[in-house]
Amino acid sequence: MASPGILEESSSGDVCSGGCPDQWEEKTEEELQCQFEQAAKHVQNVASVASTEQLLYLYARYKQVKVGRCNTPKPGFFDYEGKKKWEAWKALGDYSHQQAMTEYIETVKKLDPDWSPQALEEPYKEPKTTFGGPVVSCLYKVQETLREEDKDIFDYCRENNHSRVSHALSTGSVDVNVADDEGRSLLHWACDRGHTQLVSVILFHNAHINMQDSEGQTPLHYASACEFPDIVDLLLDHGADPSLVDNDGFQPHEVTDSKTIAAMLQQHASNGEHNKPPSLLLEMPQ
């Protein structure tokens, strides 16, 4: 979400929060666009003094200008930075193009009071930007493309590579409950990425369904937070415990924004169904 401090400043008149039509009328669309592009370029110079919340504030407005209303799915549970950026952009809703540019420019000015954009008639070259604008590089970590020989079982799990994972588990070359450095199992990863069929494969090989990572979160926490109802239902059907809490004291129904999933989990917990033995037969997915 955007920084409360920034939003408070916006309402003070220094940065528009509800719209500043008079200010927009003082600049032509071309002038505003030119100043916005210069501000986007200058962000690279002030990123080191900006807080994470200020960068998120800028990121959201950059995306609103370049793309418009948020039109991408919510990132997975593991992608914390991606989720924060998505939430900041999503919160803008139908924010106008002009309002987003104006607030972006004014915020950059606040970060560097000595900076001012060039007038339109002065020479100006549009900056080369990375995906999402320069500010993205301050928040977004691009995953390296691994060579096939460098991949491990977790990479295959993230890629939803059924054959590789199934073969490794079937031959016993990999323990189904193996964990990464953060205590996350293959089941955690499959649930985070929404790989329903792969979840079934892993459960077939008797994965510890209530295994907790270093944060105390179970695969059910992950599926709930990432809003995959089919996987939540699958986990519950095979004995996942919806009453387990993570290190912050949250149960799975408390980490999701989905009312449907929250209701499903609470209903399951109230019925005590997680105390029943899991299904005796789980067919291997084709």
UniProtKB/Swiss-Prot annotation:
Localization of this protein: Cytoplasm; Nucleus
Domain ACB: 32-117
Pfam families in the record: ACBP, Ank_2
GO cellular component: cytoplasm; nucleus
Start-end of each ANK repeat: 182-211, 215-244
UniProt cross-references to InterPro entries, sorted A to Z: Acyl-CoA-binding_protein (IPR000582), Acyl-CoA-binding_sf (IPR035984), Ankyrin_rpt (IPR002110), Ankyrin_rpt-contain_sf (IPR036770), FERM/acyl-CoA-bd_prot_sf (IPR014352)
Superkingdom as given in the UniProt entry: Eukaryota
GO molecular function ontology, one term from the record: lipid binding
Keywords: ANK repeat, Cytoplasm, Lipid-binding, Nucleus, Repeat
Residues at which an acyl-CoA binds: 59-63, 85, 104
Entry function: Binds long-chain acyl-coenzyme A molecules with a strong preference for unsaturated C18:1-CoA. Does not bind fatty acids. Plays a role in protein N-myristoylation.
Protein's name according to its UniProt entry: Acyl-CoA-binding domain-containing protein 6
